[in-house]
Amino acid sequence: MSKIFVNPSAIRAGLADLEMAEETVDLVNKNVEESQAHLQAEPIEVDALPEDMKRLQISEPKPCQLPDGTCMKEEGGDEDFYMAESGDPYIPLQSYLDTMGIQIVRKMKTGERFFKIWSQSVEEIISYVAVNFPVPPGKSLADKSTQTSVEKSKPASQPTQPKKEDQLSKVNIDSQESSGPPALDWAATNDDDDASVEAEIAHQIAESFSKKYKFPSRSSGIFLYNFEQLKMNLDDIVREAKGIPGVTRRAGDGVRLPLRCILGWVASTHSRRFQLLVNSDKLNKVMQDDINRYLAY
């Protein structure tokens, strides 16, 4: 008959587990007693309640025996300061704005530019508000005169837009033979810029900040250069880029900018190292070709 030997350490461990289990049971019982302490007190007498509590009616409300008008007044007395959801005009507006937000997110996922999406969404929201929230007829005449003057001033400025577009589309081909970036056609002026245009320019430059572009060197070869090597603030680069013909207009449309042309122009003005490496005549031709190609679209 074989003998079974038990390790003393296993016995001690088992005893320790039993002690811990007993302590756990005692702790659980104590917590249960504490949580049910309020049930061990004397029951509350109804007569001992405050006077206001006696008015509380637990039974179901009886149907109104009075005329209809009186019942409606009593039931709706507490709701005088609240508007029904069906009569609130801002609930449809909120749902419309939620729908517009979902559409904006979907368009951004497809790769469209944010500022282009936002401008279209703003126009749709303005038209929705104009249709569903018309101006009341009791408006003052001062507001109407202000709106009339604005509407009259807009048609006067519209004929100038085709002229600007014609100027932007014409690039001086003869300037390709001259040397240096100043030979660019600066007659093609940019449109009036705003914060959204600057943000679009900064966004595209920041995306390609470390990308290297090819430039013609003095040794009849090429060298690589990027925006990081300028060691300039992004705001300063954007300020210089806005002076290049067509950049502001393309940024306003949310389309791709001639980044190599922008880099070449800024570097040829602010980077001594770039000036020593680049062939000015060929650089001017490269920049002019970029502008012609981008303005053609």
From Swiss-Prot:
InterPro entries: PP_M1-like, PP_M1_C, RABV_P-like_C. Residues 140-189 are annotated as: Disordered. Phosphorylated by host PKC and by an unknown kinase. The modification Phosphoserine is found at residues 210, 271. A motif (Nuclear localization signal) lies at residues 211-214. A motif (Nuclear export signal) lies at residues 49-58. SUPFAM superfamilies: Phosphoprotein M1, C-terminal domain (SSF118173). Residues 138-172 are annotated as: DYNLL1 and DYNLL2 binding. One of its GO terms (cellular component) is host cell nucleus. Belongs to the lyssavirus protein P family. This is Phosphoprotein. It comes from Aravan virus. The gene is P.
